[in-house]
Amino acid sequence: MSKSFAYRHIWCFWRFNTPLLWFPQPLKYWPAFQQSHTFNSMSVFKNDNAIANQTTVNESDVKRNVEKINDIYECSNNTKSPCFPNSDSRIPLVNWKTSTNPTLQVRAYMLDLLLPFFTLDLLPFLNKVCECCNHMLLDNPKIKQDLPFAFCYLFSSYFSYKSSRQYTCSSEEISKVFRHLNRLGGSEYVLHLFAQIPKALCKELTDVRTLNHPLRSIFTFCFKNISNPPNLLKLLTKLYPRSDRANEVLYTQYLGFLTKRGDYQIAIYMFDEMYRTHHWSSFTACRLMIESLVRQNKFEEAISLYKKIIAKRPKIARDKKILNLLLYISTVSNRSPDAFKLALQSISNANQIPSFDVFSRLMSALVKYNMTEMILPLVKQYDHKFRNLYSPNIFLSIVQALVFCGDMVNIQRWYNMSRVNSELSRIKHLLNCFLNSSTVSLDVSMVLELLRDLKKKKIKVDERTLVICITIFSRRKDLFAMEKIHQYFSDQGIKTSNQAYAALLDAYIEAEDTEKIELYLGKIRRLGITEDVSINRMLMRLALDRLDWDLLEQCTKVAERKDPEGQDYLSTITMLYHVRQHELNLALRIFSGIQKPNVVHYSIAATVLGNLNQLDQLLLLEKRMESEGKAPTALSLVAFVSSYCKQGAEGLDEAKRYMSKNFQPDKRALLFNPRTANDMTYPPSLFSSLIKEYTSLGDIKEAKQVLSTYLEYFSKNITSKPDIPFAIASMRLYCSLHDTVLSRQFWDLILQVAQQNFITTDIAAVVDDKNIPSPSGVIPAYKSALNVAAETYFSFLASVNSFQELDQEWSRLEKLGFEYDDSLQNKRIIWLLYDDRLDAAIKRVYNIFLSSKRIEELIPDASSQNSIISFFLSPDSPLYFSTLKALRDKLDMAVEDDFVRISQGILVPTVKYLQTIRRDNEILFNLLAKV
């Protein structure tokens, strides 16, 4: 059989048994070489088993400019014209071979040469094609610009032939074809070839549901090397209208390419063309567009686009990734209730939670929007759908949500469940949650549970965990527990980081422990970390605490060099420095020099203006803050309301207006939650100044109205825990009304908060494995914390002659470990005298003020009794002259009555009683004699 006969036989078989090997639609014409091409055909395929991948073509030399390709060549029967069929008319293969167009010659030559190998599988056939290209380039390097078109046409024909015979191949095999085409410099032809691949050949390639397409990296390379991809994509939709699915894949991939690169304007244009012109709205494309808008912080536009899309394709509302985006919008933006409502509606319509991620994000959103009542029902719904598939992350999200709500009962319950049902491998992350919620961190019981489990399960901790623990205990001012946990982690080999040293220094500054401050300052200097950002900020705070201007100037220089992001903090410290120095006008001057003041700066300025009684300036400051778009926080609300309350009746009206404007129900959850205000005392403190002012003015009706507003808020918002200032203000209100029952309720509330927050932590039982708990007591920093509250309540009890209850409550506080200051001790003596208990009053004077130990503390160098008496009669005496005068008056009355009632109601003659005082406590006797 001759060679020509074999070719004719193959041609006839091919022509009548397969689809025609032409492009179904015309391609654009590429300029041909002016000179003719010659090939040495005998050099081709000397080795039929040649390996592919031998083409070495520089891609930058063969880039094409799509904008130069403007017209599709019209069909012509003139074989000398390098045009392609635009109808069913076809140009025979022999005419291509005899064409004067070099591009057609290369294509005809390759097709003529490789037709016999169409029966091979894809990879062997690709090897033949690559070998052919290599030999052709060796024979004539000038044809490299014609090879991509020929390569594309050849594989288009091959794919059509194979598809008609139910041949399938994998995406990995097809990707090798496209990579070779890219190496030849045919990025545009990659997209042409993809648009022509029969769907049956590899269904995976036309899946628009995922952005992670098998050819994604290849498409990215093409989009980078094509000068105008949008024009080419439009052209493909015209050339291959039947390849609608493939074209949608290309559009979606280009959309992903644009959004990843940040070309949002082009992305919007392309999506609009997909959505309006071609009516494509795949889940992936919609998600890409919403994501791109979210990255630009265009939350309202993203929500608007979502609404338009689901109006056309309601099923998109159930897509878990788009749902997650909506919940993300609702949690990160200042206020996006629309996004949250849409997400909730979609979840409600589907009657199920679609994924773990959506559930976790949903927990955060519920906390933010103060819908804590929905948390547990949704947890039950999740439980029903996933059948107890509680992963560590899910348990973490549930406990986090409850932590942000301050719901201690359910926190403990779900944490215990996590121990049984799941290995809570991310247990240490909960410590960070507790740090963000002072409701939980001040209670500290759950912190101890976590530390116990960290030790029991031998979970590895890091420097960040140490910093969190130090911060939690320093916030409670429990220095013993803080030092104990620091030592415990250090013994485990955890290094004390710069942030940890800063946290320790912060704690000792707060506790005013001069000795420990100097100790850690020495360590910091020896380590050479004084210019660390976190350390420098604590040194600023130390300078503020000591009113050390030189140290503050040194810190300022360091901050200007190394802490550009800390300029706001520096301005805050400088303003507070001037405020403490009573240089209020200088503080305002610093504020006016800040280019973009934050809410803290506004709060300090409001406090200063309130102290200066400048109501007009305070109103202007409020307007400026609104005009700059600064949303009020809990701190700014307290600052403005308190400052307004100091301006008399007119200021009180402004305070009421300001609070009613900013304390709307839909704003409360944004203002008062553990994320926006670490100190949960802000919500009640907001009401404290108002209740106090209305009560002092005698406007009981308004005071009750403010109190009822808070109680309504408190009953619906478990994130807010009453603090002591609020309870004192409320108790003072009911004391003024002589309401014993409600006054007692608020007093009990004060003690409840105190027992929760002011009692020492039994840290030794955790780190030392002690089964016997250590005796608890009041944290030293809080020993005198209840003096103001006690004075208010005890004065009320004395005014209504409830001396028995006063004695009980006084003893109750002493048993808890709280201490009374000298002022309260003097009042206690007066109350005893009111109750006609002279003997008890005299004994208290001796035990509290005139014991040898107290005299030694007060007058270390006392040389005689006269000097002691002189001190106690001076203005510096802790025993007030008014107290001594009341004692002397009571004794004079006893002299007139001729007897004194002592313990157990026994009556003693006054003369004998005075002799006893002179014998047992001569100093007191002589002191009273001189009054």
From Swiss-Prot:
Any Pfam family hit: PPR
Cellular localization per UniProt: Mitochondrion
GO cellular component, one term: extrinsic component of matrix side of mitochondrial inner membrane
GO biological process: mitochondrial gene expression; mitochondrial translation; mitochondrial translational initiation; positive regulation of mitochondrial translational initiation
Source species, domain of life: Eukaryota
PPR repeats: 247-277, 282-316, 429-461, 462-496, 497-531, 598-632, 683-713
Keywords for this protein: Activator, Mitochondrion, Protein biosynthesis, Repeat, RNA-binding, Transit peptide, Translation regulation
Matching InterPro entries: Pentatricopeptide_rpt, TPR-like_helical_dom_sf
Molecular function GO terms recorded: mRNA 5'-UTR binding; mRNA binding; translation activator activity; translation regulator activity
Gene3D superfamilies reported in the protein's UniProt record: Tetratricopeptide repeat domain
Transit peptide limits: 1-16
Effect of gene knockout: Impairs growth on galactose. Decreases the association of cox1, but not cob1, mRNA with the mitochondrial small ribosomal subunit.
SUBUNIT field: Component of the MRH5C complex, composed of mrh5, ppr4, mtf2, and sls1. Proteins mtf2 and sls1 form a subcomplex that serves as a scaffold to bring mrh5 and ppr4 together. The MRH5C complex associates with the small subunit of the mitochondrial ribosome.
Role this protein plays: RNA-binding translation activation factor that as part of the MRH5C complex specifically recruits cox1 mRNA to the mitochondrial ribosome for translation initiation.
Protein name (database record): Mitochondrial cox1 translation regulator ppr4
